[in-house]
A protein has these predicted regions:
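Glycine-rich phosphate/diphosphate-binding loop of Rossmann-like nucleotide-binding domains
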Residues: 1-55, 68-70, 75, 79
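Rossmann-fold NAD(P)-binding glycine/threonine-rich loop
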Residues: 57-115
Length: 116
């Protein structure tokens, strides 16, 4: 997450990082254009955290009480709030493929660098 923060700041974005002791996280997330959720808590973020037109990137990989794979965001409850102008990444079949691809690219780069 730190690398993403640095990249966004380099583009003059205002970056807010929330944690477990941040007061009223929902007030911060409702005002953001882009929200990245990466807390590791199944469906912890419901519709009260979001506003129409936002882009929500759900990085969380969790299992709910029934054993189903899910993200940090309650996708079914949040997607209607975002509306047609908004977007949300699903879990599964969302950012996981990107993460795997980037990780493999780094492994290949490291292997190639080691052969030089």
């Amino acid at each position: 997450m730190n690398k993403l923060r640095i990249l966004l700041l380099a583009r003059h974005a205002t970056v807010t990082l929330a944690h477990s002791r941040t007061a009223d996280v929902a007030a911060h997330t409702r005002e953001a254009d882009i929200v990245v959720c990466a807390t590791g808590r199944a469906r912890a973020y419901g519709p009260e955290y979001f506003s129409p037109g936002q882009t929500v990137l759900d990085v969380g990989i969790n299992f709910d009480a029934a054993g189903n794979l899910c993200g940090d965001v309650d996708f079914g409850a949040v997607e209607p709030v975002l509306g047609p102008e908004g977007a949300i990444t699903p879990v599964p079949r969302g950012l996981g493929g990107v993460t795997t691809s980037v990780t493999m690219a780094h492994v290949v780069q490291a292997a190639e660098a080691g052969q030089r």
